[in-house]
């Protein structure tokens, strides 16, 4: 029995005639899909995990039941749904085709997108960076050779502005894969750790994070193994950082236990892949005979650089593959290629494990040659060239007005809590950096991730009250490993060259790992940590552990781990080894420039505040902002209002500021008004008649001011024409200065006229004196 052909969600049963019916684009039978859907219809399963003062709720079986695996993870009122789907037919690609997408919906925050179409368009930086964190947390646990298209989608259902959704998405991906039949050696658990007043806080709220000196995301595997680390910190001490990692790993184990309990209750059975793309042992054995000695000779020839070494290895590859094709004509091309890769990787790693030597002749803890240079181009606000081995990075600093900072719209602020940002680092990796040809298009995920890491490394040392927006660009000119950490070093040098008063210099380094694993237990038997890794060491190694900071502490960390998990001990040793190397790099950088320049360069931008009296503001701005627009167009300055009488003028160069200052002085100049005497009577010329009064000028180049109807005559009038006033007529007015509240000129014609009949009353006299009339005799006698 199986479900109706026409509707997979209904529960009517009817026999299928000719075998199982398959959905379009799917290669599994509908009968298999129905078992999962019918089971889900009986109700969802859920588990709650206590994390200190927080509770993590994990559920499955209610939403997205056609997916191979789905889960909803909730903390407070923030909820994320994650689905996992994997094809059952292999992909033609020769790698693990895993796609992770994290999407934020404006509806989750109760908002409507602010773009023209009022719908989600494109992908934000936050979505890309979160997708990368999720990918790095789950990718190492897929079986080797599992080349099947797999997609993990994370959909933000609701966000309360209190609990962050990114950690929930990592846990949701773990649950979805664990509850699916997709081969995956999970689960993993993830938590965020903050340090507030010296205490570690698990999954802190958004408000708590604003006062935290650490933002650490830890993804852990069973047996207290670490799979992924991502952190930004306010230059915290190494021991505090290590303690936070240990606390994070402890709480990840509680999440893992909750997921394992849910998997046990569900009774998940993993599918058996058609094929795992691993080379035949026989072909690998023959490759050993053909290439091992030649590869050993290349990897122990310390005269090679990146280019010559790659050429030598490729020559051996071509010769070996040709002989393997003759020996094994029936073998798949992938087996031939991968057999050589396996042997090359084994030879490379054994040299490090057994001989404690690296392919460029360094020992395990040595740095490559480091050289620095600043003030590369005089016209730039700041520039630096950082060279480490064959990795070369050019960094520049540009200043602009505060108005040029990144502005977050209301939706992004509601979802992520991200507000305006006046410091940014942009990383570029052109194809020529590795002697390749490629499209030079928009930003890709890798460039965004590397730039975000370098920005995290530098942000803590940037002064918060700096009067400019700072943009650091990092262009990789040559790449042979650890270009993101070279960007942090080069960015620090460029900032000091530009005169930004950073609190301390920043340096970064990458630590690699080579392990030897027990084939039966799957545990690490032996390992070597490598300081300042090359590109080939990153490719053939098990970890890329990037850490940046000052002489005092740590500002950023990112760990890309290729193993299904590493012990805490290795992570602690890597941090210690990186700290030693970081201080050594800082000593070299200090020889080039040890502290920020005391002043910015002569061609750098300047900011000045201008006082514009309220009386001159209308003239300064001009009708419809004409004068301001003209000023900005002609001089290139940016003007923003600070308060009612103060304007901030940003000029890209001092000469532009002088030009703008002259322009402003000319606009606001009014020498004749300074000669006006308070209480004096002047002749005014009527220039315009309005319903509310007349516009008059006291002198020719004066801006006409309004003489209100109430100040035209002692009598109450509704229109100036009632007094016979005309345009061009001259009248006498008295000058009373300017109103301190709104800056308007105060004039009056009424006070110059004889007083109208009024009654003056006194508190002592019961009688009244009528002004303008003769006093009667009776009244005089009574007095």
UniProtKB/Swiss-Prot annotation:
Record-linked Pfam families: KH_1, PNPase, RNase_PH, RNase_PH_C, S1
Gene Ontology cellular component terms for the protein in this record: cytosol; membrane; mitochondrial degradosome; mitochondrial intermembrane space; mitochondrial matrix; mitochondrion
Location of the KH domain: 605-664
Membrane disposition: Peripheral membrane protein
Enzyme class: transferase
Residue list for modification N6-succinyllysine: 552
UniProt-listed InterPro entries: ExoRNase_PH_dom1, ExoRNase_PH_dom2, ExoRNase_PH_dom2_sf, KH_dom, KH_dom_type_1, KH_dom_type_1_sf, NA-bd_OB-fold, PNPase
CDD domains, alphabetized: KH-I_PNPT1, RNase_PH_PNPase_1, RNase_PH_PNPase_2, S1_like
Segments forming domain S1 motif: 679-750
Taxonomy, superkingdom: Eukaryota
Phosphoserine sites (modified residues): 754, 782
N6-acetyllysine PTM sites in chain numbering: 250, 264, 285, 289
NCBIfam families membership: polynuc_phos, PRK11824.1
Family under the similarity heading: Belongs to the polyribonucleotide nucleotidyltransferase family.
Purpose: RNA-binding protein implicated in numerous RNA metabolic processes. Catalyzes the phosphorolysis of single-stranded polyribonucleotides processively in the 3'-to-5' direction. Mitochondrial intermembrane factor with RNA-processing exoribonulease activity. Component of the mitochondrial degradosome (mtEXO) complex, that degrades 3' overhang double-stranded RNA with a 3'-to-5' directionality in an ATP-dependent manner. Involved in the degradation of non-coding mitochondrial transcripts (MT-ncRNA) and tRNA-like molecules.
Name under which the protein is recorded: Polyribonucleotide nucleotidyltransferase 1, mitochondrial
Species annotation: Pongo abelii (Sumatran orangutan)
Lineage of source species: Eukaryota, Metazoa, Chordata, Craniata, Vertebrata
UniProt gene name: PNPT1
